[in-house]
């Protein structure tokens, strides 16, 4: 626990950042506490720092919750702060609430917030969703929940960063690469500006795939995930999409949907269709820790086909690089494949004269406007 004045808050570089305190202000002005939930490097702490910079007559107490191991000691500290609040205006910030919170700590924090008055406030900052007991504050209108989505930068906000720094890169391209993830946007902006000042040039793709940016994503963001979350994210990077049924049918994981929803909540997975989730573009490269195997593609492809998702099945069977398996898949689904892949060139190499393959060859010639080939 540390006591700091507002002028001692960590600094931030305004040239490369956007003020995202509006949502925090809305909550903190109405409720005695706010809970900011977001993955690593999503801008949670910077937003809190920017908010605290504006509180000129307020002291704040910072708890690094991952270091508060003893329940009794933590509860005694809260009691001490409560007594001080009778004479002083203090805001309590509970940072790094990333590990499971004990019931005792959660109950103590709930009671602490319920008794806040006279402008005293409590701010929770976490990579994980609130402890169930903490939710009582939300239900009883004692807490405002701030999601990660409200912290992400929009194309317009990225455009303002680009203009502020005279960056010769389009904001929508940065947004496409980063999804508006604040830490990544700011890092790219700084690196582009450094290149510009040094008289050097680089493309967005080169900067995104640079050692510095790739290492940042892998270490500072993906490195905070559990092994299970990392595994799900990797599968979501290889596959067109994943869902809970796939996890249960193929890998016998009955609670896979819970992990998927948590990853979506953190911004690592995006919902690309009804109950279909894929890894966000920002993380696809680093999330793939090893090359996918033939067996993986065959298994997943068979699942997609059995569920009626022929386009996804074709993608997997093509990646399996198993010619005979692809051919039998195409024969089973000959009526749909030409309209999924109008340039299904694999059919050109098949010499069989069975109706299904003849149809596939003919449709390939039709879509490629090879009229002569249709007679073969």
Predicted segment positions?
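Amphipathic alpha-helical "lid/sensor" segments that cap RecA-like P-loop NTPase cores
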Residues: 41, 48, 145, 160-212, ...
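Conserved P-loop NTPase "ATPase switch" module shared by AAA+ and STAND
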Residues: 83-109
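Walker A/P-loop nucleotide-binding motif
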Residues: 30-48
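Alpha-helical sensor/transducer elements of the RecA-like P-loop NTPase core
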Residues: 46, 108-173, 177, 183-188, ...
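Extended alpha-helical scaffolding segments used for macromolecular assembly and cargo binding
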Residues: 293-374
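Conserved adenine-nucleotide phosphate-binding loops and their immediately adjacent elements
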Residues: 1-26
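Short capping/hinge segments at domain boundaries that bridge a core fold to an adjacent linker or tail
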Residues: 194, 209-214, 238-246, 250-302
